[in-house]
């Protein structure tokens, strides 16, 4: 089953600001995750259905939400580790509920 990729508006703005090389790396990972987004090792602790993609060499992370009933993957935020984990709870509360 293939999932549909969506971006939260704020995450899309972050995406547009990324270096094209970083975008390309994330695109490669996102294509794989759209086939199978439920990767146990990438699950974010304390958040159901939230996962991450890490680009270790570049220091970036991307957090995404899997909505099973809609068969969708939502990119929530993109950034360096310290920034991402600070804004993630705020982004979830403002965008989702």
PLM feature spans:
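Short, mixed-charge, low-aromatic patches
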Residues: 17-22, 42-46
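Compact soluble domain cores
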Residues: 21-33
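A short, surface-exposed loop/turn module that caps and links secondary-structure elements
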Residues: 31-55
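Enriched for short, Lys/Arg-rich terminal
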Residues: 2-6, 10-13, 17, 24, ...
């Amino acid at each position: 089953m293939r999932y549909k990729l969506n971006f939260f508006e704020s995450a899309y703005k972050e995406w547009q600001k990324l270096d094209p090389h970083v975008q390309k790396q994330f695109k490669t990972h996102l294509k794989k995750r759209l086939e199978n987004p439920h990767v146990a090792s990438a699950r974010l602790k304390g958040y159901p259905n939230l996962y991450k993609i890490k680009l270790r060499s570049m220091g970036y992370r991307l957090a995404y939400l899997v909505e099973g009933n809609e068969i969708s993957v939502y990119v929530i935020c993109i950034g360096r580790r310290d920034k991402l984990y600070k804004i993630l709870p705020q982004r979830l509360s403002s965008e989702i509920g």
